[in-house]
Amino acid sequence: MFSSLYPLARASLFKMDAEDAHHLTLRMLGAAGRTGLACALSPRVPDAPRTVMGLSFRNPVGLAAGLDKDGAAIDGFAALGFGFIEVGTVTPRAQPGNPRPRMFRLPEADAIINRMGFNNSGVDQFVKNVQAARYRGVLGLNIGKNADTPIERAADDYLYCLERVYPFASYVTINISSPNTKNLRQLQGAGELDALLAALKDKQRRLADLHGKLVPLALKIAPDLDDEQVKEIAATLLRHDIEGVIATNTTLSREAVKGLPHADEAGGLSGRPVFDASNAVIRKLRAELGDAVPIIGVGGIFSGEDARAKLAAGAALVQLYTGFIYRGPALVAECVKAIARGEAR
């Protein structure tokens, strides 16, 4: 029923400010998850199980980080049939993010520009929300740095967040690719990334001993990388035995949206315009990584065929964000069914 009602709901939501609509949707999904209404109204999504990063996924279609930054609506999203949920990005301390307005729809391009800036309630509240959720499927927790933490001390923030979220995560995503936190993408540089991942892997080993379980680490990277940068990142992932990589975050490019309303707004562009760039990075990563490090593909998925294209490029799993906002819950089932059909051939 959610799927059939969504076009009507979207018409109303798209008349609102984009961020206000986002918050309203989160509140509604949070309430639906707490009451069980989401399960009763959601479409049936078939199982298409697989094992990736040592984790068992009900199906390969997940929710990307950013839609639920504080983990406040985990149960509501889970009821929509996602095979896994990723929430965050969370930082050590609460922060308001960048000034509003900071989210803009570009419906002519099936796109969104955002410059949110890791607005969140801080890792302590985040952990409380995660603990309160009833969902027991694969849950990714996405961590970042506070805006006022000098880039030279960024590792301190990531290490602190990793320690706090580790006991509650199926996997932890290291987000170094948001364009909306000053200098954050510098951490994708060879030397900076090598030092950060070395520190995080050392912390992971100690936390695994403490908690009696190894929680995989995944690195989230940008689409705005040249071939040499992708090669360097891949080599660093292999050198440090990082368990996964998420490709990609939003793009700074505006080539595909030139002349459209809001196209000149600062921030990261997501949606259909990032699809090809994301797939190109996935293909380059797969060529460098082989089967050693699984890739989670995200960026511009608006149909089941789009999801299959991500897998064909080299992804093991996919995530939805902007396509989910434009298409609604029906997109989840469509992607799972398309992937299952393709694998059955």
Curated annotation (Swiss-Prot):
Cofactor note: Binds 1 FMN per subunit.
Binding site for FMN: A65, G66, L67, D68, K69, T89, N142, N175, K220, T248, G271, G300, Y321, T322
Naturally occurring in which organism (per UniProt): Burkholderia mallei (strain ATCC 23344)
Subcellular location: Cell membrane
Keywords: Cell membrane, Flavoprotein, FMN, Membrane, Oxidoreductase, Pyrimidine biosynthesis
Biological or metabolic pathway of the protein: Pyrimidine metabolism; UMP biosynthesis via de novo pathway; orotate from (S)-dihydroorotate (quinone route): step 1/1
Cofactor: FMN
Gene of this entry: pyrD
Residue stretches spanning the membrane: none
Topology of this chain in the membrane: Peripheral membrane protein
Gene Ontology BP, a term: 'de novo' UMP biosynthetic process
InterPro entries: Aldolase_TIM, DHO_dehydrogenase, Dihydroorotate_DH_1_2, Dihydroorotate_DH_2, Dihydroorotate_DH_cat, Dihydroorotate_DH_CS
List of catalytic residues: S178
Subunit structure: Monomer.
Cellular component annotations (GO), alphabetically ordered: cytoplasm; plasma membrane
Family of the protein in this entry: Belongs to the dihydroorotate dehydrogenase family. Type 2 subfamily.
Catalytic activity: (S)-dihydroorotate + a quinone = orotate + a quinol
Protein's name according to its UniProt entry: Dihydroorotate dehydrogenase (quinone)
Main location: membrane
An example Gene Ontology molecular-function term: dihydroorotate dehydrogenase (quinone) activity
